[in-house]
Swiss-Prot record:
Positions of NADP(+) binding: 11-12, 32-33, 39, 54, 75-79, 92, 143, 171, 179
Cofactor(s) required, per the database record: NADP(+)
Gene encoding the protein: hldD
Reaction(s) catalysed by this chain's protein: ADP-D-glycero-beta-D-manno-heptose = ADP-L-glycero-beta-D-manno-heptose
Domain notes: Contains a large N-terminal NADP-binding domain, and a smaller C-terminal substrate-binding domain.
Subunit structure: Homopentamer.
Protein name (Swiss-Prot/TrEMBL): ADP-L-glycero-D-manno-heptose-6-epimerase
C-alpha cells in the first residue's frame, strides 16, 4: 500500500521517509516544492516511487491516481515565523491542509500532520487546550486554526480514518541545512564553532540570565519515532505535543556543541564556566527586533502523549546534540553550501 509524505524533501519529512525505508517501506510518494532546488539532497539517498510538486499533488490524489493509500504524513508548510504575507501563509498552511483533509476523509486515509508549538505563542502553559493557545504570528495562527477545525471534527466524530496533529517544539537534527536562518540553534552553533572557534548566545532578557532562556529541544529521531508509533496505532486520533518534556537552557545546547567539537579534536570536555572563560561561548545583547516576540521558555506537557501509550524516553540535549554533531561531521559533503 502507498504512503505519501508531503514536505518530503524538507527536514522532518525526509527523516520520516528514511525511517520508512529502514522499515522496508519503498512504496512512498514524495511531495514537495523544490525551491530551493538544493533540497533534492534530502531525497538523493532515499527510496521513493514517485515525486510530485505540491501544486499538482492535490488534484492527482483527489482523482485516485495513487490507488489505495494507507497514510499521508503532511509535513509540508511554510514554517518561517518571520513571514508577514498572511494571504500566502493561510493558503499554504491552512487551506492546503483543509483540502488534503477532505481528500483523506473521502478516501479513508490516515492523516498525520504537523502542527506546531507556535500555537501556544505567548502562553506559559503548554497543554493541548484552547485556553493556553495565544499565537504570536501568522504562522502560529495558521496552525492553530486547523487544529481548531480538527477539534470540532473530533467532537462531531465525522472523521472516517485516523487524524493526528503533532505540536512540534524545537526540533533539531540531520537534514535541516536547507532551512538557512530557520535551522536549529545546534546547527548554527556547529558552523559558528567550526568557523570561529566559538558560539554566540543571547545575553540577559525577560528575567533570564545570559543563555538561560530555555526551550524544549527535541531530536528529530524522537519526532520520527512518535510519528511511526501513531502510524502503527490507527485507532488513536487527536492533537498531541511533541517535545522532550524538558526545558533546557540555550547554554546546554552551546555546551553540548562545544564539547562535541572538542571531542572531535581529542580535547577533554570543559565545563560551561570554562568555555565562557575561554570565550568559546560569547554572549551578545538581546536584539531589539525580537523583544516582545520571543518565547523565553517552552516545555511540552506530555501527559496526553503518554496516556495515548507512547512510553519511549526522549533524548536529552547532551545526548541528541552530540549525535547530531557527529552526523554533521560525517556528512559534510552532503551539506554543500549549508548556509
Amino acid at each position: 500500500m502507498t504512503i505519501i509524505v508531503t514536505g518530503a524533501a524538507g527536514f522532518i519529512g525526509a527523516n520520516i521517509v528514511q525511517a520508512l525505508n529502514v522499515r522496508g517501506e519503498k512504496n512512498i510518494i514524495a511531495v514537495d516544492d523544490l525551491r530551493p532546488a538544493d533540497k533534492y539532497r534530502n531525497l538523493a539517498d532515499l527510496d521513493i516511487i514517485d515525486y510530485l510538486d505540491k501544486d499538482e499533488f492535490l488534484e492527482a490524489f483527489r482523482s485516485g491516481r495513487f490507488g489505495k493509500v494507507k497514510a499521508v504524513f503532511h509535513e509540508g508548510a511554510c514554517s518561517d515565523t518571520m513571514e508577514t504575507d498572511g494571504i500566502f501563509m493561510m493558503a499554504n498552511n491552512y487551506r492546503y491542509t483543509m483540502d488534503l483533509l477532505d481528500i483523506c476523509t473521502a478516501q479513508k486515509v490516515q492523516l498525520l500532520y504537523a502542527s506546531s508549538a507556535a500555537t501556544y505563542g505567548g502562553s506559559d502553559v503548554f497543554v493541548e487546550s484552547r485556553e493556553h493557545e495565544k499565537p504570536l504570528n501568522i504562522y502560529g495562527y495558521s496552525k492553530f486554526l486547523f487544529d481548531q477545525v480538527m477539534r470540532k471534527r473530533f467532537a462531531e466524530k465525522t472523521n472516517t480514518a485516523q487524524v493526528v496533529g503533532f505540536r512540534y517544539f524545537n526540533v533539531y537534527g540531520p537534514r535541516e541545512s536547507h532551512k538557512g536562518r530557520m535551522a536549529s540553534v545546534a546547527f548554527h552553533q556547529y558552523y559558528q564553532y567550526k568557523a570561529n572557534g566559538h558560539v554566540k548566545l543571547f545575553g540577559e532578557y525577560g528575567g533570564y540570565g545570559a543563555g538561560e532562556q530555555s526551550r524544549d529541544f527535541v531530536s528529530v529521531e524522537d519526532v520520527v519515532k512518535v510519528n511511526l508509533f501513531f502510524l502503527d496505532h490507527p485507532e488513536i486520533s487527536g492533537i498531541f505535543n511533541l517535545g522532550s518534556g524538558r526545558a533546557q537552557p540555550f547554554n546546554d545546547v552551546a555546551h553540548a556543541v562545544a564539547n562535541a567539537m572538542r571531542k572531535l579534536d581529542k580535547a577533554a570536555p570543559a565545563s560551561l564556566q570554562e568555555l565562557v572563560k575561554e570565550k568559546a561561548i560569547e554572549y551578545i545583547p538581546f536584539p531589539d527586533a525580537l523583544k516582545g516576540r520571543y518565547q523565553c521558555f517552552t516545555q511540552a506537557d506530555l501527559t496526553k502523549l503518554r496516556a495515548a501509550g507512547y512510553a519511549e524516553p526522549f533524548l536529552t540535549v547532551e545526548q541528541g546534540v552530540g549525535r547530531y554533531i557527529e552526523w554533521l561531521e560525517a556528512n559534510s559533503s552532503f551539506l554543500a553550501n549549508p548556509l
